[in-house]
Amino acid sequence: MNPRRKKRLTLAVALVFGLGATIGLMLYALSQNMDLFYTPTELVQGKPDGTKPEVGQRLRIGGMVVEGSVKRDPQSLIVTFEVADVGPAVTITYNGILPDLFREGQGIVAQGVLVNSTTIEAHEVLAKHDEEYMPPEIAEAMKKTHEPLQYSDEQKQGRVQ
């Protein structure tokens, strides 16, 4: 093989290797930043296709805060509460200041890590905007079960107990 062809071959191999490494790193970064959305029922029972998240997986969960479930640690900012849709409840632990619109009986979306099959350690909690707002993922999940949410008059008025 003459030197000119050898140089071209080396350059082509280096280019293909570099391009492959770049694409591999991009796919790895995207997979690390992907958070899958679950409802409490899907988290406990699994999605219709049979998939369930693994312990340690990052995810988003949305539902309604169960009334009487909010417990605050008086010594720190740690808050523990339960979120449910139409099925089982999931416990969420959050260390931080909750949004002003957060209250029992209202919709939230939490982003965090699955600690065990029914507990999530959240690093972000988002509250809904008003008494009629529901995140699209939660509304779609509720439609699938054909069970509409029943709001109390106090929830519709936005009063805190």
From Swiss-Prot:
TM helices/strands, residue ranges: 9-29
GO molecular function: heme binding; metal ion binding
Record-level GO BP terms: cytochrome complex assembly
Localisation: Cell inner membrane
Topology, Cytoplasmic side: 1-8
Membrane topology (Periplasmic): 30-161
GO CC terms, sorted: plasma membrane
Membrane topology: Single-pass type II membrane protein
Ligand binding (heme): 129, 133
Keywords for this protein: Cell inner membrane, Cell membrane, Cytochrome c-type biogenesis, Heme, Iron, Membrane, Metal-binding, Signal-anchor, Transmembrane, Transmembrane helix
Function: Heme chaperone required for the biogenesis of c-type cytochromes. Transiently binds heme delivered by CcmC and transfers the heme to apo-cytochromes in a process facilitated by CcmF and CcmH.
Protein family (similarity comment): Belongs to the CcmE/CycJ family.
This protein's name: Cytochrome c-type biogenesis protein CcmE
Organism, as annotated: Photobacterium profundum (strain SS9)
